[in-house]
Design a protein with these regions (language model features):
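C-terminal helix of von Willebrand factor
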Residues: 137-179
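Exposed acidic/Ser/Thr-rich ligand/metal-binding surfaces
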Residues: 1-5, 11, 15, 19, ...
Length: 228
């Protein structure tokens, strides 16, 4: 089944993280303790393995994943909201949620709004969402939560896990093109600032162009969503 394949790939992924320093992991699950019928439990979510150094709790996470069985509904919004209290009291912009799901919200919640609120409160940075072959017409309900990957095969699922992790850990680059009245990128020598979701200035540069008309390449923290 899709769940069996996902569990196998997640265990491989956790195995690799256990070898890295300065990584903390936790495991929250949903829809796994109460049967879907006769009554849906829209609060069916639990922090199964609290955050700790990956080398310390990777074995616990792998064991819990191995024994995990889907039983109930999909309370994504409620689960994201509950995860706010899961994280240790460290730099909140390092707090990341990696949501894995084979479906969409089933409990009338708004996971996109909950995700945005937690980002605005600086509890988490932008989440990552991996859908397990989610139908095209449903993907828009997930890609507003955070960066979305739709894994249509086991290979793409594992690739999505590592791509998300790489984005979480390493800096990224960007170029800013300032357009003139004719929609040409000729404007330059302008002071520009990058702001986090709370309006706090994170970076400030003077925009310049090279002799080839290319803007500077900027190095940014990928954990923060910016406005310019």
């Amino acid at each position: 089944t899709r769940m069996d394949i996902a569990k196998k790939k997640i265990i491989e992924f956790v195995d690799s993280l256990a070898k890295l320093p300065d990584i903390q992991l936790g495991l929250r699950c949903y829809g796994h303790t109460t049967l879907y019928r006769p009554d849906r439990n829209c609060e069916d979510t639990k922090l199964e393995v609290p955050f700790d150094a990956a080398k310390s709790n990777a074995a616990l996470i792998k064991k819990r994943i191995q024994n995990l069985e889907p039983m109930g509904t999909t309370p994504i919004a409620y689960s994201i909201g509950q995860s706010a209290s899961d994280f240790p009291p460290l730099d909140s912009f390092n707090n990341r949620i990696l949501l894995i799901t084979d479906g969409i919200e089933e409990c009338q919640g708004n996971p996109c709004q909950v995700s945005l609120e937690l980002q605005q409160k600086k509890i988490i940075a932008k989440p990552y969402v991996i859908g397990m072959n989610v139908a095209l017409q449903d993907q828009h309900q997930l890609d507003c939560i955070g960066r979305f990957f739709n894994a249509e095969s086991p290979e793409l699922f594992l690739k999505a896990l590592y791509t998300a992790f790489s984005d979480m850990q390493y800096a990224t680059t960007a170029q800013v093109y300032l357009l003139d009245d004719f929609q040409k990128p000729t404007e330059t020598d302008v002071l520009m600032s990058f702001y986090d979701p709370e309006g706090i200035e994170r970076y400030q540069w003077i925009h310049t162009l090279s002799n080839l008309g290319l803007p500077d390449t900027l190095i940014l923290n990928p954990r923060i969503p910016y406005t310019l």
